[in-house]
């Protein structure tokens, strides 16, 4: 005679989920999957640094706006540059996206503040990803941050070239003749 307890153990469906209430669910849903962010990502996501905006019309402010169509992340980064030294004296960001995108933006603002614009454009996404321990599936977030700083510097430089027009040879010659 076979005991009832043996039959319960012999039934593979009962062994698959002994501690979980048995409900009709797909096998792939039986074990919850959990993605954990690194503590640095959680810190920058929970307490983002330098969130806000600067006046985009100021000539010493450069604005970079970039996005990733694949995931929907949008990042705006603004830098305020000291005109005499070329040093980034303030930086602000607003990011609409996942925790990794927000953390990448926040970390980048800390990284570029106090650097020259030449130093800032040399920052690579790999440095951001390494510092935040981003998984490969989230590398695009650090790429957005790299693109944002390059775009902000480009905008700043374009404003500077408009602010300080240079005299062409004809204008300089006409000015000499007029005096």
Swiss-Prot record:
Pathway: Cofactor biosynthesis; iron-sulfur cluster biosynthesis. Keywords: 2Fe-2S, Iron, Iron-sulfur, Metal-binding, Mitochondrion, Transit peptide. Gene3D superfamilies: 3.90.1010.10. Residues 160-179 are annotated as: Disordered. CDD domains: IscU_like. Pfam families: NifU_N. GO terms for cellular component: mitochondrial matrix. Binds 1 [2Fe-2S] cluster per subunit. One of its GO terms (biological process) is iron-sulfur cluster assembly. It is found in: Mitochondrion matrix. Its main location: mitochondrion. InterPro entries: ISCU (IPR011339), NIF_FeS_clus_asmbl_NifU_N (IPR002871). NCBIfam families: iscU. Scaffold protein for the de novo synthesis of iron-sulfur (Fe-S) clusters within mitochondria, which is required for maturation of both mitochondrial and cytoplasmic [2Fe-2S] and [4Fe-4S] proteins. First, a [2Fe-2S] cluster is transiently assembled on the scaffold protein ISU1. In a second step, the cluster is released from ISU1, transferred to a glutaredoxin, followed by the formation of mitochondrial [2Fe-2S] proteins, the synthesis of [4Fe-4S] clusters and their target-specific insertion into the recipient apoproteins. Component of the core Fe-S cluster (ISC) assembly machinery. Belongs to the NifU family. PANTHER family: IRON-SULFUR CLUSTER ASSEMBLY ENZYME NIFU HOMOLOG (PTHR10093). This is Iron sulfur cluster assembly protein 1, mitochondrial. It comes from Debaryomyces hansenii (strain ATCC 36239 / CBS 767 / BCRC 21394 / JCM 1990 / NBRC 0083 / IGC 2968). The gene is ISU1.
């Amino acid at each position: 005679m076979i005991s009832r307890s043996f039959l319960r153990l012999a039934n593979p469906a009962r062994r698959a989920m002994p501690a979980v209430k048995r409900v009709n669910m797909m096998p792939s849903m039986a074990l919850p999957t959990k993605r954990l962010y690194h503590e640095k990502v959680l810190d920058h996501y929970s307490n983002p640094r330098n969130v806000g905006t600067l006046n985009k019309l100021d000539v010493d402010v450069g604005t970079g706006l970039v996005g990733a169509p694949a995931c929907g992340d949008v990042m705006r980064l603004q830098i305020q540059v000291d005109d005499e030294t070329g040093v980034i004296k303030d930086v602000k960001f607003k990011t609409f996206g996942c925790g990794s995108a927000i953390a990448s933006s926040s970390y980048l603002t800390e990284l570029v503040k106090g650097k020259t614009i030449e130093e800032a454009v040399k920052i690579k996404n790999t440095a951001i990803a390494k510092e935040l321990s981003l998984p490969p599936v989230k590398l695009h977030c650090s790429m957005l941050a790299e693109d944002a700083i390059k775009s902000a510097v480009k905008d700043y430089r374009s404003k500077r070239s408009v602010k300080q027009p240079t005299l062409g040879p004809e204008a300089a010659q006409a000015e000499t003749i007029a005096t």
